[in-house]
Structure formats: structure tokens, C-alpha cells
């Protein structure tokens, strides 16, 4: 198996490192536009192989897409962060050009690849990748909800005093601090509803802290997080390559599911060798469905910016 990670920044490099450590692929390519960055990080990772015991061959490349040929899965992390004074339209315009170019170049050399989108704004970049490439919808996956759900489990574990691994909890909707919807009503701790163990105030606090999880980290460390986003991308790669059929929240194309069409939003899906394989309807209540519709409206307004480019 062969995996490519486009973008050798903190998120991309962390994702690649997780993939290598787990021995998910025989070959791993790290690609970046900045001269020497991908090559240097690839060599650094390869020098851990003797210490960590993996055999994945990691290659770095400066913008040479021929090195990515034959990739089974491609993780796209490319794009610029939003800078002070930059409008939403400017951010979308800049990153849309980057993501579209990356996807087109990748598919020239790996026409059968499954694409995992991490670039922001993630919901809109996933929609762009789908519409610009014309790929079957199951081969375009936005990572956002996988990360948001992991952050939700972290917040729950802190209040419950339990292992995050013992929790089942998902976040649906858009990948943004005003568009995500942590479904605390459906969250369980080894099959028991978490709401049995948490006060109403605690539940509200957990939801609020989950929604600003990314912003909280940016404030603390001065830049966007990278460990959890990178790990989330690698977890999706693992479920694809090992055909695990694991359940994740991912940003995928909807065609009537959850009452939405012509949009990519975070919903529960199974992830296997064919990409995303099945959307699960968790049965939102009236309040949750209203929030989901509001989230869709916000994401759709972001997508509308693409039409002006």
C-alpha cells in the first residue's frame, strides 16, 4: 500500500509520522511546495525507524507529483491559515486554488486514490474537491468530525474521570466552533448514557468546551493544533487500508440524508477500503435537527463563495 501526505507542516508531518509508526503502508510520500521541507522531515522520520521498529519507506519531495504515483490514499493538509485582517472570502479564495491544484495533480498520477481533506475551511474544501474532480463521492472524505468527536470524548472523560476509549460520542455538522453539534444526548460510557452521570450544567459546559476546542488550543500555543488533527487523519487512513469499517464522523456528500442535499457535512459514516461506505442515521431529535439545518445553512453560505471565484 502507498500513502501520500500533501503538506509537510505540523499537521501533515504528524499525520505521516502516525502512519509510519503504525506500519499502515509500505511506502509513504511527504510532499510540500517549500524547498527541502518534506525531504528533511522524511529523513528525520526515517531515522526513527531503527528505534521504533517500522519498515515503511518514507520519501520527501518538493512539489514533484510523479513521486506520488500509485497512491491508494492521499491526505491533503495544504493551505494557508487565516491571517489577521483576512476576510473569509480571501481565505476561501486562496485555499480553494491550492486544494483544487493539489487534487488535480494527485489524480493525474493516482486516478484511483481516496482523498482525505484536512485543509480549512474543511467543509468547503471537501465540497470543492468533490465538485472539481468529479470523483465518486465515497472517495472524498473530510476529516473534521473525526477530530471534533475526539475532542468531545476528551472533554467528557475529564468530567467523568474515565478513559476516553470507553466512550462513544460523536459530533456532527460543520467543522467550526459555531457549526459543530456535539450529540451529548446520544453519548455513552460503556453503553450507559453519560447524561446519567452529569448535571445539566456539566453537560452544557462540555458541549461549549468542545465547540471552542480548536480555538482554545490556538490561544494557548499561539498556532493551530497538530497532534490530534494529524492523529485523526492517520486513523482514517488506517480504517481505509485495513478495511476496518470503523464508525467515524466525517464530512461527506449528502443526498437527502439528514434532510440535506448538495453539501458536504459531518455525519456518522463507516470507513473501509472503498472510502466512506455507509451513512448512519442516528435519529436526531427536533432541537438537534434544527441545529443541523442551521449548520448546513452556514456551510452553504461558505460554499457560495466558491461560485464567485
Regions found by a protein language model. Give the residues of each.
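Glycine-rich Rossmann-fold phosphate-binding loop(s) that bind the pyrophosphate
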Residues: 8-9
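C-terminal substrate-binding/catalytic lobe of Rossmann-fold NAD(P)-dependent dehydrogenases
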Residues: 133-139, 148-309
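Conserved N-terminal Rossmann-fold NAD(P) cofactor-binding segment
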Residues: 33-71, 300-307
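Rossmann-like NAD(P)(H) cofactor-binding subdomain of soluble oxidoreductases
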Residues: 87-153
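Rossmann-like NAD(P)-binding element
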Residues: 50-114
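Extreme N-terminal starter segment of soluble prokaryotic enzymes
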Residues: 1-3
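N-terminal Rossmann-fold NAD(P) dinucleotide-binding loop
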Residues: 12-13
